[in-house]
């Protein structure tokens, strides 16, 4: 009788004792990696090219028959016939498609000889959505209606195939929802495994049933680029499914950024710069602000309308993001440290010299007036994000390498914090400050009013001063001795002060230990954010001028404890911080 362990994991049941791709115990290697290794080992090249095959070109050699019979058992990617027109496009990051062939895991569809591909049917759907009505009828055909049969269009969509075997790299991805932990309350969260293409070049093929001239083919490819500009596959609003040098036709806002911090890691501890962290931050701040103005159900629903989600029925949000950068502008590093009594640890770091965050309208039918309102709201949320925090891991804390290096010099402390900046034309997004308290409090009040107006457009009546609010750790409403938030700030005339308070008593024997959060097995999210923000004046011509001292900002979500009460009294009576909000 055959041994069940000889059966490839691909064909084993997702039950205990067989193949549980979503289960990882005692820091062991996830079964997903063995699953992927069994699938992809045949496709790795034996040469020194790292699995690469020649890139496609427009020659007839590339357009050979896509025939698994002729080239069975070949590790070379499938190729199109001579009649097909093809173009390669490279992903900016990852692409998620669900073949729907496995229980409990999302993975790409598999075609001839086990190659993953982007299905022609999905390609046709994306193309049709980018067409005018006339173009859709001509190219894609007329679907059947009642007694009337369907009429085929002139185009045949052949799908998209990897141009080389680099698709086998970095397939294991994770979806790690943390909204509950980040905003509402601490709790255990699980990272779910999925398989997605990572920075793969796909060659897309289209053929026609009739002869077309070059001008018409240019029109067809323009429509296709409009389609992929909106993103392909799933999770496009979080930065998946985007392609290099193909801008979104629905872009509302472009923000140029630079930043440094701690790199995210996958299940196997591989570090990866993950652009979905931008949407996570913007969505999280939306939920915080709405949570301070209305009840939980309404706050979550309005957040889902704006950014999308799967709470209840899956919803395509009004806004989505993509993030692009040149490879030369992103550098990775390491921070080694040895905690007392333990072995050396390595923390992966990133330093991004320049990148562009694009925020797009996800609904093409949105009116020009509503687009403008969404653009203004998105701009304000981005400004709020960089005013009080950052993006990615450790976003609540100021970058210690830049602002508190002595803490790291002994080599026994982990890296903490991040630091993000507006650059180039986006420097205009910095808030000009004449009066620290008035200018920043007005900005926060104005943003809350924008959310009030947004909610009204969705049919909800809320008000910034509404006494109804969510009982969350980080719901954004004025502190009332039970919950809420306070923002404190100071212009740094001498030195940055608060960064040291997280590591030593800030007054006498009083520390922030119970307020700053912790990492490890029993991690807790801190109630304090600390940000070093550039100080800009607006001159007589309305142009921003950078001032030498920065601004130090503390955002505090107090709880009804003695630690919180003492720290508030200290800030108010015995520090040079002023209460901003």
What are these regions (language model features)?
Residues 1-581:
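Basic, Gly/Ser/Thr-rich N-terminal segments that form RNA-phosphate-binding interfaces in CRISPR RAMP
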């Amino acid at each position: 009788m055959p041994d069940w362990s000889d059966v490839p994991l691909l064909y084993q049941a997702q039950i205990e004792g067989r193949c549980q791709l979503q289960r990882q115990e005692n820091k062991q290697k996830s079964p997903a990696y063995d699953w992927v290794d069994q699938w992809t080992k045949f496709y790795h090249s034996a040469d020194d090219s790292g699995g690469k095959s020649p890139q496609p070109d427009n020659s007839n050699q590339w357009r050979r028959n896509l025939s698994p019979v002729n080239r069975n058992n070949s590790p070379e990617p499938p190729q199109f016939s001579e009649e097909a027109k093809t173009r390669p496009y490279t992903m900016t990051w990852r692409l998620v498609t669900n073949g729907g062939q496995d229980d409990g895991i999302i993975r790409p569809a598999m075609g001839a000889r086990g190659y993953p591909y982007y299905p022609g049917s999905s390609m046709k759907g994306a193309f049709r959505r980018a067409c005018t009505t006339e173009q859709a009828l001509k190219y894609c055909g007329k679907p059947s209606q009642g007694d009337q049969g369907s009429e085929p269009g002139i185009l045949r969509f052949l799908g998209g195939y990897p141009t080389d075997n680099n698709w086998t790299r970095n397939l294991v991805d994770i979806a790690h929802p943390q909204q509950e932990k980040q905003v509402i309350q601490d709790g255990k969260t699980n990272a779910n495994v999925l398989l997605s293409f990572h920075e793969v070049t796909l060659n897309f093929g289209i053929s026609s049933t009739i002869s077309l001239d070059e001008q018409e083919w240019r029109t067809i490819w323009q429509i296709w680029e409009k389609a992929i500009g909106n993103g392909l596959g799933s999770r496009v609003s979080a930065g998946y499914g985007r392609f290099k040098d193909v801008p979104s036709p629905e872009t509302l806002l472009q923000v140029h950024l630079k930043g440094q911090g701690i790199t995210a890691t996958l299940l196997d501890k591989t570090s990866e710069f993950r652009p979905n962290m931008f949407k996570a931050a913007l969505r999280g701040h939306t939920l915080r602000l709405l949570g301070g103005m209305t009840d939980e159900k309404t706050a979550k629903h309005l957040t889902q309308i704006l950014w999308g989600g799967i709470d209840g029925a899956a919803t395509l949000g009004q806004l989505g993001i993509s993030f692009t950068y040149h490879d030369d502008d992103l550098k990775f590093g390491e921070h080694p440290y040895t905690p007392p009594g333990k072995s050396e640890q390595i923390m992966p770091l990133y330093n991004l010299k320049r990148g562009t965050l694009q925020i797009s309208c996800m609904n093409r039918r949105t009116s020009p007036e509503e687009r403008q309102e969404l653009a203004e709201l998105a701009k304000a949320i981005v400004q709020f994000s960089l005013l009080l925090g950052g993006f990615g891991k450790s976003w609540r804390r100021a970058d210690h390498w830049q602002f508190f290096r002595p803490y790291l010099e002994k080599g026994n402390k982990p890296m903490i914090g991040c630091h993000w900046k507006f650059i180039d034309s986006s420097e205009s997004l910095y808030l000009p400050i004449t009066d620290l308290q008035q200018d920043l409090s007005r900005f926060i009040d104005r943003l809350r009013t924008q959310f009030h107006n947004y909610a009204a457009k969705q049919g909800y009546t809320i008000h910034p001063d509404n006494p109804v609010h969510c009982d969350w750790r980080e719901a954004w409403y004025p502190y009332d001795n039970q919950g809420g938030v306070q923002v404190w700030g100071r212009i740094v005339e001498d030195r940055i002060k608060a960064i040291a308070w997280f590591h030593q008593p800030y007054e006498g024997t009083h520390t922030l230990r119970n307020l700053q959060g912790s990492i490890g097995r029993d991690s807790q999210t801190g109630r304090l954010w600390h940000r070093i923000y550039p100080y800009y004046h607006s001159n007589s011509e309305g142009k921003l001028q950078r001032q030498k001292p920065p601004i130090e900002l503390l955002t505090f979500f107090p709880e009804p404890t003695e630690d919180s009460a003492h720290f508030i009294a200290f800030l108010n009576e015995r520090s040079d911080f002023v209460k901003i909000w």
